Amino acid sequence: MSDRQAALDMALKQIEKQFGKGSIMKLGEQAERRVSTVSSGSLALDVALGVGGYPRGRIIEIYGPESSGKTTVSLHAIAEVQRQGGQAAFIDAEHAMDPVYAQKLGVNIDELLLSQPDTGEQGLEIAEALVRSGAVDIIVIDSVAALVPKAEIEGDMGDSHVGLQARLMSQALRKLSGAINKSKTIAIFINQIREKVGVMFGNPETTPGGRALKFYSTVRLEVRRAEQLKQGNDIVGNKTKVKVVKNKVAPPFRVAEVDIMYGEGISREGEILDMASELDIVQKSGAWYSYNEERLGQGRENSKQFLKENTDLREEIAFFIREHHGISEDSGAEGAEDSTLLD
């Protein structure tokens, strides 16, 4: 063995002794090369994400205009984690959590940890403490825009606090990112949209909280309402587009289209029907939808209602959709190779 190799081996032993086993290794020895995921609670979004759900131990940003469905998308993820026996937490900086609506989406509100912090620092410190405990599987911060720094709250109404929130987020994410990765916690940051003043060309929209969250996020989702869903003259929900604008674990820019029904959340029947029709698993002839020569109903809403009443048939169709896209039933726990190892 050469002197250089002996010196390297000694240095590696010293590093492992000081910082623990696994603190340094060769890239090819990486034990876990695949991304472990948890379903988003929406089959269409699981497919758009490319790995079958949200990657564990990563930061996710969900942003969009007001009332576009950001919190609904996050609550579905919480419900899915709880369904698998995991622990969830919700940092409600907006003080707008509706427990009745959350319950309708499948969230077990008796087990959900809820914090309504007074300041941005307090909210992020609570989030850090929960992440470092290693006992929380998913944490949702709603929203970044509402994480107001203490200095701004204690100051007068007209005071200028330029860059204060951006500095707070930058510092918090520097501390949080490593802990999130080690604890395998999914951290979802909900964010709002602001208009940049004086932008003549390009997109004038931006998200508050500075650039740090954009950099630290593994996945960024843009949620926007596409059209209203009507039953007769009544508006019963919105067709919503969820665009994956950044993805470090699969190809980005895929779009999931879902029906968000008032009081119900994401319509599983709607997304299954649309995806199955695209793949010709369900055949559409005129206004009629059919599966294996069995008629589901005339028109989309009637077919959705039929699938709602026949859950075994609905899940059978969902199985074939997952199989076509290579997503396993356990939310794609095998995932895909982690491309961030090469970032």
UniProtKB/Swiss-Prot annotation:
Its main location: cytoplasm. One of its GO terms (molecular function) is damaged DNA binding. ATP binds at residues 64-71. InterPro entries: AAA+_ATPase, DNA_recomb/repair_RecA, DNA_recomb/repair_RecA_CS, P-loop_NTPase, RecA-like_C, RecA-like_N, RecA_ATP-bd, RecA_C_sf. PROSITE patterns: RECA_1, RECA_2, RECA_3. GO terms for cellular component: cytoplasm. CDD domains: RecA. It comes from the Bacteria. It is found in: Cytoplasm. Keywords: ATP-binding, Cytoplasm, DNA damage, DNA recombination, DNA repair, DNA-binding, Nucleotide-binding, SOS response. Signal peptide: none annotated. GO terms for biological process: DNA recombination; DNA repair; SOS response. Belongs to the RecA family. Can catalyze the hydrolysis of ATP in the presence of single-stranded DNA, the ATP-dependent uptake of single-stranded DNA by duplex DNA, and the ATP-dependent hybridization of homologous single-stranded DNAs. It interacts with LexA causing its activation and leading to its autocatalytic cleavage. This is Protein RecA. It comes from Bacillus cereus (strain ATCC 14579 / DSM 31 / CCUG 7414 / JCM 2152 / NBRC 15305 / NCIMB 9373 / NCTC 2599 / NRRL B-3711). The lineage of its organism: Bacteria, Bacillati, Bacillota, Bacilli, Bacillales. The gene is recA.
